[in-house]
Amino acid sequence: HAALGRRPQFAEFVPDMRRLSGFLSPAEEEAQRAAFVADFMQRAEFQGIYGSLLTPNQAANFIAKLEEKAGVTLPATTTTLPGQPPQYGRAELIQKMSSGEFTAAQTLRAFIEQKVVFDAFFFRAFVAMQYFGYLLRDPEDAGYNDWVDVLTNGRGSIPPGDFRHLIFGFVWSVEYRQRFGP
C-alpha cells in the first residue's frame, strides 16, 4: 500500500487479491485493475489522505502526497524499458493529470507502476507475501523488519537479494509445518 504509507494487512489483501486474479484475458485483467484502483480510491483511508487532491488543479499536490506516503521521489525523466508499464517523469505525470489526459485513478496507477516505486517496495512486498502465503497472517514487526533487512543488506554469508534463505526460513518454520499436523 505505497499510496497509504503502510503495509497491507492480511485481511484486506486476500479479498483484494481475489479481485485481481483468476482466469482472465488480458482485456479482462486490465478492466479488473482499473476497477480495483477506482474502488480503492473510494476507501475511507484513501479519501482521508487524498480526498481534496483528486482534481486536475491539485495534480502537483496529489503527486507530492503520493511521494510522501510512499517515501519516494519520482525522477525528472525516465525511460520505459521493454516489459515495463509506461514510465513518466514527475513533471510529465503532473501534466497528464492537470491537463485532464489522466484521471486521478489513472495517475495513481501510473505512479504505483513507476520503477522507482516498484524498487522501493519489492523486498517489502516479497516478505509480506511470505507471511500471507505460508503463515496466513500479518507479519509481526520485528520479524518482518529483520527479513526486509536481510534481503536489502544481506547478512553474514547471505548476499543481498538472496530469496532462497527467506523462503527456506518460512518453509522450515515450526509455525508453517504445524499447519500440516504434528
Go through each PLM region and give its residues.
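Composition-driven recognition of low-complexity segments enriched
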Residues: 1-182
